[in-house]
Amino acid sequence: MVATPLPPTQSPRHPSLQELSLSELQTWLDELAERIITGETLDRATAIALTEIEGEEKILALCAAADRVRQACCGNTVDLCSIVNIKSGNCSENCSFCAQSAHHPGQDSPIYGMKTPEDILAQARAAAAAGAKRFCLVSQGRGPKYNSPKSTEFEQILATVRAIIAETNIKPCCALGEVTPEQAQALKEAGVSRYNHNLESSENFFPEVATTHSWRDRVETIKTLKAAGIQACTGGILGLGESWQDRVDLALALRELEVESVPLNLLNPRAGTLLGEQSKLDPFTALKAIAIFRLILPQQIIRYAGGREAVMGELQALGLKAGINAMLVGHYLTTMGQPPEQDHAMLAGLGLQGGEAPIPGEYVRASQVREL
């Protein structure tokens, strides 16, 4: 099916969405969800118009429309993954939010070299026991592309990936930074099927995030990985100080790149970083953003990532009714997550089940087969 853009929401005959009554807005959103489910794409003007929606009741109406799209396009399986910080601290990059950057001397993040394959394998087994289906090896630094010729770290990572495949039932992923085409191919051959490399924010806002590398550097890395046949796990962070236009433009860039998985981190400010005094997002602002991402990316895996506990608090479950269909379980890179048992109980209470969610197109194709 060839996707066609949705018509703009605003015209001389159509008021701002915020001017609609709740019932009028619900009707409009129901129609919007149905058009997206049947294959139309959300254009930028309509997405920007959705950002005008304010007030808890109206935001929940937006979430309900996004949840309808999620159910139709992705089903009720919530993709569960876990991560391990295999090398921490003293990072060369100056990302404003990150406690691992050597540019933020006031932070107190742990600093250690590459973990042993045995340590990583033990954590992979623990992640599998907690219900995770994927396990991502995350390392600080700009990436293996810039490793010293004498470094053996990349080869050690490849060996660890092979060991995880041989000795567990969990799928290994990596988040190592920039890679060459040859390194991407080596990761693919070792068994890495998905790689995390976030855009963090829009191209326009990115200079506020980091200046030691560019947004385009990140895009090129994603293209290199996809050219090697590796799925892209690519998203960003909400709450860096970006505008609503930046959030929409990030989602549109992810759609253009055809990424498979979209982790949405909610900034949990870390002391000693440039954003250490930044206010956390309001939970309903986060919900609105999640819902808009789902409407722009109807078939993508959209993942609750870092900061969900700190930002959403008791409203975490609402994210799973606003378009989220994946979660990172266990601990994060430098902060603690909630116990996996609590996550599984939350899913069960919503009638959802943890597992491995389909990549874009798979669930729709499966549904079409079932209807024949």
Swiss-Prot record:
It comes from the Bacteria. It catalyses: (4R,5S)-dethiobiotin + (sulfur carrier)-SH + 2 reduced [2Fe-2S]-[ferredoxin] + 2 S-adenosyl-L-methionine = (sulfur carrier)-H + biotin + 2 5'-deoxyadenosine + 2 L-methionine + 2 oxidized [2Fe-2S]-[ferredoxin]. Its cofactor is [4Fe-4S] cluster; [2Fe-2S] cluster. One of its GO terms (biological process) is biotin biosynthetic process. It is an enzyme of class 2 (transferase). [2Fe-2S] cluster binds at residues 136, 173, 233, 303. Residues 73-308 form the Radical SAM core domain. Pathway: Cofactor biosynthesis; biotin biosynthesis; biotin from 7,8-diaminononanoate: step 2/2. Binds 1 [4Fe-4S] cluster. The cluster is coordinated with 3 cysteines and an exchangeable S-adenosyl-L-methionine. Binds 1 [2Fe-2S] cluster. The cluster is coordinated with 3 cysteines and 1 arginine. GO terms for molecular function: 2 iron, 2 sulfur cluster binding; 4 iron, 4 sulfur cluster binding; biotin synthase activity; iron ion binding. Its EC number is 2.8.1.6. PANTHER family: BIOTIN SYNTHASE, BIOTIN SYNTHASE, MITOCHONDRIAL. Belongs to the radical SAM superfamily. Biotin synthase family. Catalyzes the conversion of dethiobiotin (DTB) to biotin by the insertion of a sulfur atom into dethiobiotin via a radical-based mechanism. This is Biotin synthase.
